[in-house]
Amino acid sequence: MPHQQILMLFGLLPVATNISTWWNFGSMLLACSTLQVLTGFFLAVHYTANINMAFSSIIHITRDVPYGWLMQNLHAIGASMFFICIYIHIARGLYYGSYLNKETWLSGTTLLIMLMATAFFGYVLPWGQMSFWAATVITNLLTAIPYLGSTMTTWLWGGFAINDPTLTRFFALHFILPFGIISLSSLHILLLHEEGSSNPLGTNSDIDKIPFHPYQTYKDLLMLAMLTTLLLMIVSFFPDIFNDPDNFSKANPLVTPQHIKPEWYFLFAYGILRSIPNKLGGALALTMSIMILLTVPFTHTSKLRSMMFRPLMQLMFWTFAATFLVISWSSTKPVEPPFTTISQAAALMYFLFFISKPLMGLMENKIMKT
């Protein structure tokens, strides 16, 4: 297709005039996923999915492969950038009522689950101490499922403990899932353009729209330039900022790290898991911390779509954002008072947001009537 025709297609795509920078994170996520697939391919070429050689193959990539250190750091830090963008993208959807486009929201939540699974499998691949123990702790949660738990865990591990078959299948899953993510992302974008993007006011945009190109393309390019600058600065100057010191040691099943914790982007879910002193209860809470997003489109009761003109709801939303950060912070601390109490209070507040959101909507409707 000639260059002008592609631009014409973008030019014919109508977009609301007043969409803010928060709407740029979708295109940034697309850029992140492209980066992850490309760097991931070059890493997979040199990686060896064997428990005796995996750790050494990572060292080989960073030391001996030309620009291997760059590929490895771009892939690891790119994952963090991906999660920063996706959490902002979800927060924007919650704040401005984008979830009322139900199909788009449900496909997006499925994408989040797939992304979290992919990131978890990827974290296991270097076969460092924290990789091994994080895999042990999380896969062990399957044993909490009544009747089927033990069988499912053995099936997932490929044996009676985490071993070579586990690493091989995790590598296979880590390689194949991104293609599922790309397919579902295409569906997500397709469903979005059935109705079109919402806007900060939460009103119908049909009366005031502009062409996507050149206005939004340049806006997207500016944000992409900022994201790329931030990514390259971290890769160049602080490459180990998101890494756990324990993961620089090879996996040893006989030595348990003092404090097992996942990557920062899973800390909120891990904090919710840890706040319940019961295996099955914790596993259910962990699952619900993500699955509860699926309920949001069906529990919207307010007559207003966006939170822009709902001060009480804004207060609740920013309390929820602070709660998310508090859970993440408390998860990095040892399992002892006061951190356990903080985790439990924050986990309760996390779920209370989703429970009180429809009630707040009904209350606001009553206030508007009077």
From Swiss-Prot:
Residues annotated as binding a ubiquinone are: H193
Annotated PROSITE patterns? CYTB_CTER, CYTB_NTER
Top-rank lineage group of the source organism: Eukaryota
Q: Does the keyword Transmembrane helix apply?
A: yes
Instruction: Note the CDD domains from the entry.
Output: cytochrome_b_C, Cytochrome_b_N
Q: Name one GO biological process term.
A: mitochondrial electron transport, ubiquinol to cytochrome c
UniProt cross-references to InterPro entries, sorted A to Z: Cyt_b/b6_C (IPR005798), Cyt_b/b6_C_sf (IPR036150), Cyt_b/b6_N (IPR005797), Cytb/b6-like_sf (IPR027387), Cytochrome_b (IPR030689), Cytochrome_b_C_euk/bac (IPR048260), Cytochrome_b_N_euk/bac (IPR048259), Di-haem_cyt_TM (IPR016174)
| One cellular-component annotation, GO | respiratory chain complex III
Q: Where in the cell is it found?
A: Mitochondrion inner membrane
Name the residues that bind heme b b566. H89, H188
| Membrane-spanning residues | 25-45, 69-90, 105-125, 170-190, 218-238, 280-300, 312-332, 339-358
Q: Which residues bind heme b b562?
A: H75, H174
Per the entry, which co-factors are needed?
heme b
What's its job? Component of the ubiquinol-cytochrome c reductase complex (complex III or cytochrome b-c1 complex) that is part of the mitochondrial respiratory chain. The b-c1 complex mediates electron transfer from ubiquinol to cytochrome c. Contributes to the generation of a proton gradient across the mitochondrial membrane that is then used for ATP synthesis.
**Partners and quaternary state?**
The cytochrome bc1 complex contains 3 respiratory subunits (MT-CYB, CYC1 and UQCRFS1), 2 core proteins (UQCRC1 and UQCRC2) and probably 6 low-molecular weight proteins.
The family classification in the record reads: Belongs to the cytochrome b family.
Name of the protein in its database record? Cytochrome b
State the organism named in the record: Chilabothrus subflavus (Jamaican yellow boa)
